Amino acid sequence: MHASSAMTRRVIVIAPSTTLRTAWELMVTCRIRHLPVVRGGLLLGIVSDRDALVHGRIVGDAIEVPEVEVAEVMSPFPFVCDPTTHVADVVRTMVEEKIDAMPVLDAGERLVGLVTSTDLLLLLAESSLTRPLPFAFELAPHEEPPAT
């Protein structure tokens, strides 16, 4: 199974000049956690809800997010894959790099999709028990770290 089978194809993107506050409002409204930052169809970086939370502050029951441009706070050069990348490789990279979203680029380096941890969980949930999963899955017991 390839990234093209798991990715979200209708991806909301923003320009690097978009403010972090606007990006945050878009994420809240659309119930998403990641926004690829593009210019001319080319991926420049990715901004997440975590960026808004790190740079914002809590005021009462709300989060006040600054008017800084996302180009200043985005993660530039994110890990990416192509539509033919095996899902197991996407999962492995996302786990090893502790990321929750991976942009999918075509041969022309244009954004064609986004694989998120939610997409992968939905893929896992939709997998029939009669079909093997496209990646290894096992439960490991929790071990307490040694006392220091």
Spans of model-derived segments:
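A glycine-centered beta-loop-beta connector
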Residues: M27-C30, L35-D51, M94, M102-D119
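The conserved cystathionine-beta-synthase
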Residues: V13-R31, V38-R39, V80-K98, L105, ...
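Tandem CBS (Bateman) regulatory domains
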Residues: M1-R10, S48-V80, H86-E97, L111, ...
